[in-house]
Protein backbone atom coordinates (compact mmCIF):
# COMPACT_ATOMS: atom_id res chain seq x y z
CA UNK A 1 0.00 0.00 0.00
CA UNK A 2 3.03 2.30 0.28
CA UNK A 3 2.59 3.15 -3.39
CA UNK A 4 -0.71 4.96 -2.74
CA UNK A 5 -1.23 8.02 -0.60
CA UNK A 6 -4.81 8.76 0.49
CA UNK A 7 -5.80 12.35 -0.26
CA UNK A 8 -9.40 12.43 1.00
CA UNK A 9 -12.44 10.25 1.52
CA UNK A 10 -14.79 10.78 -1.42
CA UNK A 11 -17.63 8.43 -0.67
CA UNK A 12 -19.02 5.27 0.77
CA UNK A 13 -19.80 2.65 -1.81
CA UNK A 14 -21.70 -0.61 -1.50
CA UNK A 15 -18.62 -2.43 -0.23
CA UNK A 16 -16.59 0.10 1.71
CA UNK A 17 -14.95 3.51 1.78
CA UNK A 18 -13.73 5.13 -1.43
CA UNK A 19 -10.75 7.48 -1.29
CA UNK A 20 -9.24 9.90 -3.71
CA UNK A 21 -5.56 8.95 -3.66
CA UNK A 22 -2.26 9.60 -5.37
CA UNK A 23 0.00 7.05 -6.97
CA UNK A 24 3.42 7.98 -5.58
CA UNK A 25 5.18 6.34 -8.52
CA UNK A 26 3.32 8.01 -11.40
CA UNK A 27 1.87 10.98 -9.47
CA UNK A 28 -1.49 10.07 -11.01
CA UNK A 29 -4.76 10.67 -9.12
CA UNK A 30 -6.63 7.41 -8.60
CA UNK A 31 -9.72 6.14 -6.76
CA UNK A 32 -8.96 3.64 -4.01
CA UNK A 33 -11.79 1.35 -2.91
CA UNK A 34 -11.32 -0.39 0.39
CA UNK A 35 -13.39 -3.57 0.34
CA UNK A 36 -14.83 -4.37 3.74
CA UNK A 37 -15.28 -8.10 4.02
CA UNK A 38 -18.00 -9.67 6.14
CA UNK A 39 -15.70 -12.33 7.56
CA UNK A 40 -12.91 -10.01 8.65
CA UNK A 41 -11.18 -12.76 10.62
CA UNK A 42 -10.90 -15.12 7.66
CA UNK A 43 -9.19 -12.70 5.32
CA UNK A 44 -10.05 -12.34 1.67
CA UNK A 45 -11.83 -15.31 0.06
CA UNK A 46 -9.78 -16.84 -2.75
CA UNK A 47 -12.86 -16.83 -4.98
CA UNK A 48 -13.06 -13.03 -4.63
CA UNK A 49 -9.38 -12.69 -5.51
CA UNK A 50 -9.90 -14.85 -8.61
CA UNK A 51 -12.96 -12.91 -9.74
CA UNK A 52 -11.25 -9.57 -9.24
CA UNK A 53 -8.11 -10.66 -11.06
CA UNK A 54 -10.25 -11.40 -14.12
CA UNK A 55 -11.59 -7.84 -14.06
CA UNK A 56 -8.10 -6.42 -14.61
CA UNK A 57 -8.27 -7.93 -18.10
CA UNK A 58 -11.37 -5.90 -18.97
CA UNK A 59 -10.39 -2.92 -21.08
CA UNK A 60 -12.95 -0.78 -22.88
CA UNK A 61 -13.43 2.96 -23.20
CA UNK A 62 -16.81 2.75 -21.42
CA UNK A 63 -15.57 0.75 -18.43
CA UNK A 64 -13.79 2.29 -15.44
CA UNK A 65 -10.41 0.63 -15.55
CA UNK A 66 -9.31 -1.51 -12.61
CA UNK A 67 -5.60 -0.71 -12.49
CA UNK A 68 -4.41 -2.67 -9.52
CA UNK A 69 -5.50 -4.98 -6.70
CA UNK A 70 -3.70 -4.70 -3.38
CA UNK A 71 -4.19 -7.42 -0.81
CA UNK A 72 -2.91 -6.43 2.60
CA UNK A 73 -3.74 -7.42 6.21
CA UNK A 74 -7.03 -9.18 5.46
CA UNK A 75 -8.12 -6.19 3.42
CA UNK A 76 -8.56 -5.76 -0.26
CA UNK A 77 -7.95 -2.45 -1.99
CA UNK A 78 -9.03 -1.90 -5.58
CA UNK A 79 -7.29 0.85 -7.54
CA UNK A 80 -9.39 2.50 -10.25
CA UNK A 81 -8.93 5.44 -12.58
CA UNK A 82 -10.32 8.58 -10.90
CA UNK A 83 -13.50 10.28 -12.14
CA UNK A 84 -15.33 12.71 -9.86
CA UNK A 85 -18.73 13.00 -11.55
CA UNK A 86 -21.47 10.39 -11.72
CA UNK A 87 -24.73 10.37 -13.69
CA UNK A 88 -26.87 10.97 -10.60
CA UNK A 89 -24.88 14.08 -9.62
CA UNK A 90 -24.94 15.20 -13.24
CA UNK A 91 -28.74 14.81 -13.53
CA UNK A 92 -29.24 16.65 -10.22
CA UNK A 93 -26.84 19.51 -10.96
CA UNK A 94 -27.51 20.12 -14.65
CA UNK A 95 -31.11 19.34 -15.53
CA UNK A 96 -30.54 21.13 -18.86
CA UNK A 97 -28.50 18.12 -20.03
CA UNK A 98 -31.65 16.04 -19.93
CA UNK A 99 -33.48 18.54 -22.11
CA UNK A 100 -31.03 17.61 -24.85
CA UNK A 101 -32.25 14.31 -26.34
CA UNK A 102 -28.91 13.92 -28.12
CA UNK A 103 -27.03 13.91 -24.82
CA UNK A 104 -29.39 11.30 -23.38
CA UNK A 105 -28.90 9.24 -26.53
CA UNK A 106 -25.09 9.54 -26.38
CA UNK A 107 -25.01 8.49 -22.72
CA UNK A 108 -27.38 5.58 -23.31
CA UNK A 109 -25.32 4.42 -26.28
CA UNK A 110 -22.13 4.43 -24.22
CA UNK A 111 -23.78 2.56 -21.33
CA UNK A 112 -24.94 -0.13 -23.76
CA UNK A 113 -21.51 -0.37 -25.42
CA UNK A 114 -19.88 -0.92 -22.03
CA UNK A 115 -22.46 -3.52 -21.06
CA UNK A 116 -22.25 -5.37 -24.37
CA UNK A 117 -18.48 -5.61 -23.87
CA UNK A 118 -18.82 -6.97 -20.33
CA UNK A 119 -21.52 -9.44 -21.32
CA UNK A 120 -19.35 -10.68 -24.19
CA UNK A 121 -16.78 -11.54 -21.49
CA UNK A 122 -19.52 -13.26 -19.45
CA UNK A 123 -19.31 -10.63 -16.71
CA UNK A 124 -22.53 -9.26 -15.16
CA UNK A 125 -22.92 -6.05 -13.22
CA UNK A 126 -26.14 -6.78 -11.30
CA UNK A 127 -26.21 -3.44 -9.49
CA UNK A 128 -26.30 -0.78 -12.22
CA UNK A 129 -27.62 2.62 -11.13
CA UNK A 130 -26.88 6.27 -11.99
CA UNK A 131 -24.40 6.46 -9.08
CA UNK A 132 -22.04 3.95 -10.68
CA UNK A 133 -22.09 5.47 -14.14
CA UNK A 134 -19.16 7.89 -14.10
CA UNK A 135 -18.67 10.82 -16.45
CA UNK A 136 -15.38 12.23 -17.68
CA UNK A 137 -16.03 15.99 -17.73
CA UNK A 138 -13.34 16.66 -20.30
CA UNK A 139 -14.67 14.33 -22.98
CA UNK A 140 -18.29 13.84 -21.83
CA UNK A 141 -17.62 10.14 -22.09
CA UNK A 142 -19.38 7.79 -19.72
CA UNK A 143 -17.87 4.77 -17.96
CA UNK A 144 -19.38 1.96 -15.92
CA UNK A 145 -17.96 1.41 -12.45
CA UNK A 146 -18.13 -1.66 -10.18
CA UNK A 147 -18.66 -4.22 -12.94
CA UNK A 148 -18.15 -7.77 -11.68
CA UNK A 149 -17.98 -6.84 -7.99
CA UNK A 150 -21.38 -8.40 -7.22
CA UNK A 151 -20.12 -11.81 -8.25
CA UNK A 152 -16.92 -11.44 -6.27
CA UNK A 153 -18.46 -10.10 -3.07
CA UNK A 154 -22.24 -10.56 -3.31
CA UNK A 155 -24.71 -7.68 -2.98
CA UNK A 156 -25.52 -6.81 0.60
CA UNK A 157 -29.02 -5.68 1.61
CA UNK A 158 -27.43 -2.68 3.28
CA UNK A 159 -24.11 -0.97 2.71
CA UNK A 160 -21.50 -1.08 5.45
CA UNK A 161 -22.87 2.31 6.64
CA UNK A 162 -26.37 0.75 6.84
CA UNK A 163 -27.76 2.55 3.83
CA UNK A 164 -30.28 0.42 2.01
CA UNK A 165 -28.98 -0.74 -1.37
CA UNK A 166 -31.46 0.63 -3.92
CA UNK A 167 -34.06 -1.63 -5.52
CA UNK A 168 -35.14 0.91 -8.15
CA UNK A 169 -33.11 -0.67 -10.95
CA UNK A 170 -33.52 -4.32 -9.95
CA UNK A 171 -34.96 -6.71 -12.54
CA UNK A 172 -38.30 -8.44 -11.86
CA UNK A 173 -36.80 -11.94 -12.09
CA UNK A 174 -34.44 -11.11 -9.19
CA UNK A 175 -37.30 -9.54 -7.19
CA UNK A 176 -39.35 -12.71 -7.78
CA UNK A 177 -36.57 -14.85 -6.35
CA UNK A 178 -35.08 -16.38 -9.50
CA UNK A 179 -31.71 -18.02 -8.82
CA UNK A 180 -30.88 -18.37 -12.51
CA UNK A 181 -30.76 -14.79 -13.69
CA UNK A 182 -28.22 -13.67 -16.26
CA UNK A 183 -27.24 -10.77 -18.54
CA UNK A 184 -30.85 -9.52 -19.05
CA UNK A 185 -30.81 -8.14 -15.46
CA UNK A 186 -28.37 -5.43 -16.57
CA UNK A 187 -30.42 -4.52 -19.64
CA UNK A 188 -33.44 -4.02 -17.35
CA UNK A 189 -31.42 -1.63 -15.16
CA UNK A 190 -30.35 0.35 -18.22
CA UNK A 191 -33.99 0.64 -19.32
CA UNK A 192 -34.84 2.13 -15.91
CA UNK A 193 -31.91 4.58 -16.21
CA UNK A 194 -32.95 5.53 -19.78
CA UNK A 195 -36.47 6.42 -18.62
CA UNK A 196 -35.04 8.34 -15.65
CA UNK A 197 -32.78 10.43 -17.91
CA UNK A 198 -35.77 11.33 -20.10
CA UNK A 199 -38.32 11.90 -17.30
CA UNK A 200 -35.84 13.40 -14.82
CA UNK A 201 -37.20 11.16 -12.08
CA UNK A 202 -36.87 7.45 -11.26
CA UNK A 203 -39.31 5.17 -13.07
CA UNK A 204 -39.86 2.57 -10.31
CA UNK A 205 -38.83 4.13 -6.95
CA UNK A 206 -39.91 1.26 -4.68
CA UNK A 207 -39.05 1.25 -0.97
CA UNK A 208 -39.34 -2.52 -0.44
CA UNK A 209 -39.18 -5.56 -2.70
CA UNK A 210 -42.96 -5.90 -2.90
CA UNK A 211 -43.45 -2.16 -3.43
CA UNK A 212 -40.82 -2.29 -6.20
CA UNK A 213 -42.59 -5.21 -7.91
CA UNK A 214 -45.98 -3.53 -7.68
CA UNK A 215 -44.61 -0.25 -9.10
CA UNK A 216 -43.30 -2.28 -12.06
CA UNK A 217 -46.56 -4.21 -12.51
CA UNK A 218 -48.71 -1.05 -12.34
CA UNK A 219 -46.92 0.25 -15.43
CA UNK A 220 -46.00 -2.89 -17.37
CA UNK A 221 -48.90 -5.08 -16.24
CA UNK A 222 -48.87 -8.05 -13.86
CA UNK A 223 -47.19 -10.98 -15.63
CA UNK A 224 -48.90 -14.33 -16.12
CA UNK A 225 -48.07 -17.60 -17.89
CA UNK A 226 -49.14 -16.15 -21.26
CA UNK A 227 -46.92 -13.06 -21.08
CA UNK A 228 -44.03 -14.70 -19.19
CA UNK A 229 -43.97 -18.51 -19.32
CA UNK A 230 -42.64 -19.93 -16.05
CA UNK A 231 -43.25 -16.79 -13.98
CA UNK A 232 -45.77 -18.47 -11.64
CA UNK A 233 -43.13 -21.04 -10.66
CA UNK A 234 -40.65 -18.40 -9.41
CA UNK A 235 -40.13 -18.64 -5.61
CA UNK A 236 -41.67 -15.28 -4.71
CA UNK A 237 -44.51 -15.13 -7.25
CA UNK A 238 -47.94 -15.08 -5.59
CA UNK A 239 -51.21 -15.87 -7.37
CA UNK A 240 -52.77 -13.21 -5.12
CA UNK A 241 -50.79 -10.36 -6.75
CA UNK A 242 -53.22 -7.67 -8.01
CA UNK A 243 -53.72 -8.05 -11.77
CA UNK A 244 -52.86 -4.70 -13.34
CA UNK A 245 -53.18 -4.17 -17.11
CA UNK A 246 -50.14 -2.72 -18.93
CA UNK A 247 -50.06 1.04 -19.59
CA UNK A 248 -49.03 2.62 -22.87
CA UNK A 249 -45.35 3.57 -22.35
CA UNK A 250 -45.89 6.74 -24.42
CA UNK A 251 -48.00 8.09 -21.54
CA UNK A 252 -45.36 7.08 -18.98
CA UNK A 253 -42.37 8.57 -20.84
CA UNK A 254 -44.08 11.29 -22.92
CA UNK A 255 -40.91 13.06 -24.08
CA UNK A 256 -39.51 10.07 -25.94
CA UNK A 257 -39.88 9.63 -29.71
CA UNK A 258 -41.26 6.46 -31.33
CA UNK A 259 -37.84 4.83 -31.87
CA UNK A 260 -36.88 5.56 -28.26
CA UNK A 261 -40.13 4.08 -26.97
CA UNK A 262 -39.59 0.98 -29.09
CA UNK A 263 -36.11 0.51 -27.63
CA UNK A 264 -37.27 1.24 -24.07
CA UNK A 265 -40.13 -1.26 -24.28
CA UNK A 266 -37.77 -3.97 -25.52
CA UNK A 267 -35.42 -3.29 -22.58
CA UNK A 268 -38.26 -3.26 -20.05
CA UNK A 269 -39.71 -6.57 -21.16
CA UNK A 270 -40.82 -8.45 -18.02
CA UNK A 271 -39.84 -11.85 -19.44
CA UNK A 272 -36.02 -11.85 -19.43
CA UNK A 273 -35.88 -14.33 -22.32
CA UNK A 274 -37.65 -11.78 -24.55
CA UNK A 275 -35.65 -8.75 -23.37
CA UNK A 276 -33.36 -7.19 -25.98
CA UNK A 277 -29.62 -7.86 -25.54
CA UNK A 278 -27.11 -5.03 -25.17
CA UNK A 279 -25.36 -6.21 -28.35
CA UNK A 280 -28.58 -5.89 -30.39
CA UNK A 281 -29.67 -2.69 -28.60
CA UNK A 282 -26.59 -0.75 -29.80
CA UNK A 283 -27.72 -1.45 -33.38
CA UNK A 284 -31.24 -0.09 -32.75
CA UNK A 285 -32.66 2.55 -35.10
CA UNK A 286 -32.88 4.99 -32.16
CA UNK A 287 -29.09 5.39 -32.52
CA UNK A 288 -29.05 5.71 -36.31
CA UNK A 289 -28.38 9.48 -36.21
CA UNK A 290 -25.31 9.26 -34.01
CA UNK A 291 -22.00 8.33 -35.45
CA UNK A 292 -19.85 7.73 -32.44
CA UNK A 293 -16.21 8.43 -33.15
CA UNK A 294 -13.94 6.52 -30.75
Swiss-Prot record:
Reactions this protein catalyses: L-seryl-[protein] + ATP = O-phospho-L-seryl-[protein] + ADP + H(+); L-threonyl-[protein] + ATP = O-phospho-L-threonyl-[protein] + ADP + H(+); [DNA-directed RNA polymerase] + ATP = phospho-[DNA-directed RNA polymerase] + ADP + H(+)
Sequence positions that bind ATP: 10-18, 33
Entry annotation: catalytic residues: 127 (proton acceptor)
GO cellular component, one term: cyclin-dependent protein kinase holoenzyme complex
Cystine residue pairs: none
InterPro entries the record matches: CDK, Kinase-like_dom_sf, Prot_kinase_dom, Protein_kinase_ATP_BS, Ser/Thr_kinase_AS
PANTHER family per the UniProt record, alphabetical: CELL DIVISION PROTEIN KINASE, CYCLIN-DEPENDENT KINASE A-1
Name the record gives this protein: Cell division control protein 2 homolog
Gene symbol of the encoding locus: CDC2
Amino acid sequence: MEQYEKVEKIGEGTYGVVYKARDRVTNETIALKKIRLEQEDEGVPSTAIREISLLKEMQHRNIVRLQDVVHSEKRLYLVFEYLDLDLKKHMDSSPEFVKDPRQVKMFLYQILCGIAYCHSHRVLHRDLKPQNLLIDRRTNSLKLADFGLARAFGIPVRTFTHEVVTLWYRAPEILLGSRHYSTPVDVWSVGCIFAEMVNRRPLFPGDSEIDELFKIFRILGTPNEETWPGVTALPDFKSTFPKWPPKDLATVVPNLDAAGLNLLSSMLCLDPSKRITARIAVEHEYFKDIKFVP
